[in-house]
Amino acid sequence: MATAGSSYSVSTDHQVSSPLVNLGNVAGVCIMSNAWKVEQEPSLINFISAFLSANSFRLNFVSIPPDLIFNCGGVSIAFVFVTKWDFSNVASIFSRVKRLKGQFAQLYVVATLSTKEQSDSFMRSYFQYEMEFGKPAFVQVTDAEMGFEKIVKIAHSRGVCKQQKVASKLKVERKRTVQDTNIFIRFVTSIPNINKHDANTLYQAIGSIEAIAKASKEDILANTDLSSKKADTLTRFFQDPEFYLSPKFN
């Protein structure tokens, strides 16, 4: 469903990667949705099969709600894998993600966004369908092969963490990330005329406060949906002393 009408073209410069570093004795199983499989080109399925084999994962085909489920190191992680961003199918992608979020405690969405138009469409849709930041986590990639490699690395890392009993450390890191995000949003929304939506957009598209401070007006306009006036306000706030040192009264 998430990849209805999807297509896949073989990249001539992609080869099956060598096994993951420090995989050790972690046994992994990849369960692939039958419905998702039939929507993909055989070349992609062949790449996936070879990559999993190289990294000591078994591959099973089963009728499951998400596109992929990885069982690794005692942890089950579900994935929605959008191999082609279909502009006409955006609503069903996000409604499916919301439904699966309630069914799987650990869910990731990996989306192939190979053009600026696709990336812009994703950003607009992310806010239009009121997704909660980080729930689930979205991972953007430029091609399907890269996307699957990231999926395996995510599953592998979660399995290793489970085996090493570092779940408490992950919880602390997650809390710290949320705190850092909240600090970022509070700081950016303190800038005149910049609201929470703008702050979230800047966080997704540009990143840190330092990166925004260095960004030009053109960079902000090219990577976000902010207006020209707001982009000008941001660049002046960070780069024009007369602007950021002057008092702001309504």
Swiss-Prot record:
EC numbers, comma separated: 3.1.-.-
Molecular-function GO term, any one: endonuclease activity
Bridged cysteine pairs (disulfide): none
Protein name: Protein PARTING DANCERS
Alphabetized Pfam families for the sequence: HHH_5
Phenotype when the gene is knocked out: Reduction in the number of class I crossovers (COs) during meiosis. Delay in the formation of synaptonemal complexes (SC) as well as a few unsynapsed axial elements in early pachytene nuclei in some meiocytes. Early nodules (ENs) are observed on the central element of SC. Reduced fertility due to altered male and female meiosis.
GO cellular component: chromosome; nucleus
Top-rank EC class of the record's enzyme: hydrolase
